[in-house]
C-alpha cells in the first residue's frame, strides 16, 4: 500500500488496516517458523506497510497540535 493511498483513509480506517496487517504479520511469522512460507518478501512488505501507517498517524496527530 502506498503512502498516498494511506493518506486518503480516515483515522479509523488506518487503525483497522494496521490491525489487519499485524494479524497478517503474525500469520506469516507462524508460517515461516513452520517452514510453510513461500513468499518471504511478503513479511517485509507487511512490516513496511505497518510502519507507513504508524508514520502517517503520528503526522496527523502532530498536525492537530
From Swiss-Prot:
InterPro entries: Ribosomal_protein_uL29, Ribosomal_uL29, Ribosomal_uL29_CS, Ribosomal_uL29_sf. Keywords: Ribonucleoprotein, Ribosomal protein. GO terms for cellular component: cytosolic large ribosomal subunit. GO terms for biological process: translation. Signal peptide: none annotated. It comes from the Bacteria. Pfam families: Ribosomal_L29 (PF00831). NCBIfam families: L29. This is Large ribosomal subunit protein uL29. The lineage of its organism: Bacteria, Bacillati, Bacillota, Bacilli, Lactobacillales.
Amino acid at each position: 500500500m502506498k503512502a498516498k493511498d494511506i493518506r486518503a483513509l480516515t483515522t479509523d480506517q488506518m487503525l483497522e488496516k494496521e490491525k489487519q496487517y499485524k494479524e497478517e504479520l503474525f500469520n506469516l511469522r507462524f508460517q515461516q517458523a513452520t517452514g510453510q512460507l513461500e513468499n518471504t518478501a511478503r513479511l517485509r512488505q507487511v512490516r513496511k506497510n505497518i510502519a507507513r501507517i504508524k508514520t502517517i498517524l503520528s503526522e496527523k496527530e502532530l498536525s492537530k497540535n
